[in-house]
Amino acid sequence: MKEAGRFAKVSVRLYLNDGYSAPEMPEENDIDFGSAEYRRMLEASLVNLGDTKRLEKALCKARAGQDVTIAFIGGSITQGAGAIPINTECYAYKTYKAFCGMFGDGDNIHYIKAGVGGTPSELGMIRYERDVLRNFTVQPDIVVVEFAVNDAGDETNGVCYESLVRKILMSENEPAVVLLFSVFSDDYNLEERLRPVGFNYKLPMVSVKECVVPQFYDAARRIITKNQYFYDCFHPTNAGHKVMADCLGTLFEKVDIKAQKALETAGGDLKEALKAIGDTAFDNESAAPHYGNSFEKVELFDRQNLPTMDIVWNFDMGGFNRIDDELQCVEMDMDIETTPEFPYNWKHDRSGR
């Protein structure tokens, strides 16, 4: 009987036909995650600290024992592709667990993972309310946005990505936004397009590319090889997911120094510490977009939420009177079981009825 989460190991032996040869695979050293050189790699990932006030407030709340929710939205890497098992070895879960470890037993820290393989920020900005906010029942304190390798087909050239970022920044509870730039095995990502968005809003930015790619080509300083980092040409191995989590952890460590100082100066009074950190409101009117903000107020309408909206709808669905149940499914949060995407849809009835 098949059981979710159970894995087996197999040995695969490849043979070459006569007359063919293959280069000998060099022996790889164990990854020294505790070395000073590894620490320098992680430091290189912090391409911009920006204005960390929102993040400081979230860390202060966590240190004070208040409930704090950390959310992740992105593509297949955020979903956990390459990680085995996908729900507990992915970078998002590893980051969450490290975050819990920074703040006592972590019972006050909550986790949302909303990665969908093969999807860009064009879809991310539409599903944010459902997959991250859970139809406005959740207010995350920190949102990590990871679309640096998914947006190549974005016809708006950054407008969708920036619209998603602005949508999060405009949230009433003022969550911290962290931009995370993952990388493919050919060293490709779109961070040169996306960095200006982060600089425009003074956001913390973490580049996995800056962390791992330079050392791939420096034999004297190499800590992890491409073969060790990548599961395939797109996704990280368990070790690669750990590197990504450690990059984010390095950011949190640096900002936590400020958070601890704010709490100490306030004598442990959380309210006073938050007040001292300063205003973090997002002024939508004065914050000019870098690429554009055409979609910052876009909303998802489907069979579930359409009837609840304070709008009078009068239209004929025509042939779209069925529901499609053959949907892409993903592992949300800590689940090993999958959840269908966009289940409350309209499907065309080809019979014409």
Language model: regions and residue ranges:
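N-terminal secretory targeting modules
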Residues: 1-73, 78-86, 104-108, 138, ...
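Alpha-helical cap/lid subdomain in secreted, periplasmic
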Residues: 5, 15-19, 63-66, 90-110, ...
